[in-house]
A protein has these predicted regions:
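Long lumenal/extracellular ectodomains of secretory and single-pass membrane proteins
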Residues: 1-140, 150-184
C-alpha cells in the first residue's frame, strides 16, 4: 500500500491501521509489513503527501475536535497532512474560479459595478457560543473559520462570536491542532 496514492476518505478512515496502532493507540502488529506500512505512512504525512483534497470537512472537523487534546502525535501528523491537502485544494479552486470570473468580467467590458469580489478579502467570524456546542456543530464551524482565516489576505486573525467576543491571531504555518486549540 502506498499511503500517498490512497483516496482521502480511505486514508482518514483507516489511519490507525496505516499507522499500525489499535483503537487504544497500542501497537497493532509486530509483522514487518505492518511496521513498514506505518513507516511509509509517517514519511508521507511528514512530507504532506497524504491526500485530503476530497474530504468531507465536517468529518475532518469532528476528528480534529476529538484529537486536538490527544497525545498521539503520529495520528495528528497524518490528519494535519490531510487538512493541508484539503486547504491547498480549496485555495487552488478558489483562485482558479476567481481568475475565471475576472477574465469573463474583462471580456464583458470591465464595468466596475460588476467586478467580481475578491474572495480572499475576508475576515472570518467563528461562532463559539454555547448553542454551537449544543447543536454539535462547533467543530465544523471552527474548522471552516480557520480555513477562511488562512485564505484571507486581510490578516491572520478571526473574530469569535460569543458572550465575550475576541480577536484571535493565528500563525498560518502552525499545524491545524495548534490553531484549533486557540479557539476551543
Amino acid at each position: 500500500i502506498n499511503p500517498s496514492k490512497m483516496t482521502s476518505g480511505s486514508s482518514l478512515k483507516y489511519r490507525k491501521y496505516l499507522m499500525n496502532v489499535d483503537f487504544d493507540d497500542y501497537i497493532r502488529s509486530h509483522n514487518p509489513d505492518a511496521i513498514a506500512l506505518a513507516e511509509r505512512t509517517l514519511k508521507a504525512a511528514t512530507n504532506n503527501s497524504i491526500n485530503g483534497a476530497g474530504l468531507d470537512s465536517v468529518k475532518l472537523a469532528n476528528i480534529i475536535g476529538k484529537l486536538y487534546m490527544n497525545n498521539n502525535e503520529t495520528e495528528k501528523l497524518l490528519v494535519n497532512a490531510q487538512f493541508n491537502s484539503l486547504f491547498d485544494s480549496i485555495k487552488k479552486n478558489l483562485q482558479e474560479e476567481h481568475e475565471r470570473l475576472i477574465d469573463e468580467w474583462a471580456k464583458n467590458g470591465s464595468n466596475p459595478k460588476n467586478k467580481p469580489l475578491d474572495p480572499f478579502n475576508v475576515i472570518a467570524t467563528i461562532d463559539v457560543s454555547g448553542s454551537m456546542s449544543g447543536a454539535n456543530v462547533i467543530n465544523p464551524a471552527v474548522l471552516l473559520g480557520i480555513i477562511v482565516t488562512k485564505l484571507s489576505t486581510v490578516g491572520n486573525f478571526f473574530i469569535t462570536f460569543s458572550e465575550n467576543p475576541t480577536i484571535v491571531t493565528i500563525n498560518p504555518e502552525d499545524n491545524i491542532f495548534d490553531i484549533f486549540s486557540l479557539v476551543m
